[in-house]
Amino acid sequence: MLGEFELVVLLAVLRLGDEAYGGSILEEIARRTRRPVARGSVYITLDRLEAKGLLGSERGDPTPIRGGRAKRFFRLRPRGLRVLKRTLADLGRLQEGLAVLREGLMGA
């Protein structure tokens, strides 16, 4: 099973498709979770997911706006998609039948 932030990063990469690079992934996570996200955490997690074989990456063309640096674009590999689907299914089974999730914690 994936860790929580690994799951969030993979979902962001999947959602962004061809536009999944470090900055866009960070913005997508912050916007969707409404939580601050540390740039270093995103890049460390991307590197770890790539080392696990769940993500692939390639460099785009250098741009003057980035001081001549190229963006590094990420994509889910087939194994990454399988692990993502399995993790989401596992989480779904874990929360099945938990009335507290339907009714709110302690009636809140």
Could you say what each language-model-derived stretch is?
Residues 70:
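Exposed loop/turn and edge beta-strand positions of beta-sandwich/beta-sheet ligand-binding modules
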Residues 1-41:
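N-terminal helix-turn-helix DNA-binding core of bacterial DNA-binding proteins
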Residues 52-67, 75:
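Beta-hairpin "wing" of winged helix-turn-helix
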Residues 79-108:
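Amphipathic alpha-helical dimerization/coiled-coil segments
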Residues 10, 73-75:
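Short aromatic/hydrophobic contact patches that present stacked aromatics
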Residues 42-49:
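Basic amphipathic alpha-helical segments that dock to polyanions
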Residues 29, 33, 59-61, 78:
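Short, well-ordered turn and helix-capping elements at secondary-structure junctions
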